């Protein structure tokens, strides 16, 4: 399994994927920004390193050998991102004051965005709610994490997932 399944990273960081078992795997990124790769890892302990060169929300990574092995990377050019906890909440610290766009992403329901006015030295709270009317993504898996890239003092954000 890719662990964590959903994570945020910065443009320029190096992704490191390790095969922890004695089974053939491959790492196949389904990039829409030209940052794709498809590399086999036939042996336990093999490590593949790749520098993430372009912003992409979300970069889907999967194993073609094992269809249940899939993960997502929110690749952004700044440090303002988080993955929600089990309750669907997260905090992003030190966001610059002013108008900022906050975007959340869910594997099944896609992206939602809001513009917020961040006050210097204050806390801003934002709530997102997926209604179930959003266009479902191509995958049938539902996950508990949301990736929250903020474009550009503490910001506390609350993301609500649709409850079935």
Question: Which role does the model predict for each range below?
Answer:
Residues 1-164:
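Extracytoplasmic copper-binding redox domains, predominantly the cupredoxin/blue-copper superfamily
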């Amino acid at each position: 399994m890719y662990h964590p399944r959903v994570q945020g990273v910065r443009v320029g960081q190096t992704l490191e994927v390790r095969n922890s078992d004695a089974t053939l795997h491959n790492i196949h990124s389904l990039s829409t920004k030209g940052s794709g790769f498809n590399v086999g890892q036939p042996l336990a302990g093999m490590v593949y390193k790749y520098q993430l060169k372009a912003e992409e929300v979300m970069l889907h990574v999967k194993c073609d050998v094992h269809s249940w092995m899939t993960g997502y990377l929110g690749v952004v050019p700044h440090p303002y991102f988080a993955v929600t906890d089990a309750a669907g909440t997260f905090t992003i610290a030190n966001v610059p004051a002013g108008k900022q766009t906050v975007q959340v992403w869910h594997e099944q329901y896609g992206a939602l965005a809001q513009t917020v006015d961040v006050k210097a030295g204050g806390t801003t709270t934002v709530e997102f709610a997926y209604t179930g009317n959003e266009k479902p993504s191509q995958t049938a898996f539902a996950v508990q994490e949301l990736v929250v890239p903020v474009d550009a003092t503490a910001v506390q954000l609350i993301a609500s997932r649709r409850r079935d």
